[in-house]
């Protein structure tokens, strides 16, 4: 009987270690680098991962909005892409932590405005 209990304890401990490894692997899915690699071939999956990353707060919100914008743009949903690019731009202009990111979002906004035939707005972002 004692032998049987020892085997059950060892199996339980082994199971816990294997689950811990899976958790570490799952957390690597919610990184900016991984999502940037998959948003072109799998935009819907990237959007699901972005929702979870936003809930877990593993990526800053301005970057989440940028990646959402790029994913929607890849699915030819230009209005949603513009909306999320604008959200990222507004967060950048409020916090002013990363001027390169703000410039990148300004370029995206100009491109999305031109795609939606809003040329005056596109010129405003371009200037």
Residue map of PLM features:
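Sec-dependent N-terminal signal peptides
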Residues: 3-12
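A "functional boundary" signal
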Residues: 17-127
């Amino acid at each position: 009987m004692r032998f049987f209990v020892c085997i059950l304890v060892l199996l339980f401990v082994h199971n816990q270690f294997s689950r811990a490894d899976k958790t570490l692997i799952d957390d690597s899915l919610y990184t900016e680098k991984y999502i940037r690699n998959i948003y072109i071939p799998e935009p819907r999956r990237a959007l699901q991962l972005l929702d979870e990353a936003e809930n877990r707060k593993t990526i800053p919100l301005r970057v989440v909005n940028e990646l959402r914008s790029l994913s929607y743009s890849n699915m030819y949903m230009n209005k949603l892409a513009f909306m999320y690019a604008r959200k990222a731009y507004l967060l950048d202009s409020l916090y002013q932590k990363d001027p390169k990111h703000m410039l990148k979002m300004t370029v995206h906004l100009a491109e999305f405005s031109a795609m939606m035939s809003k040329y005056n707005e596109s010129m405003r972002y371009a200037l």
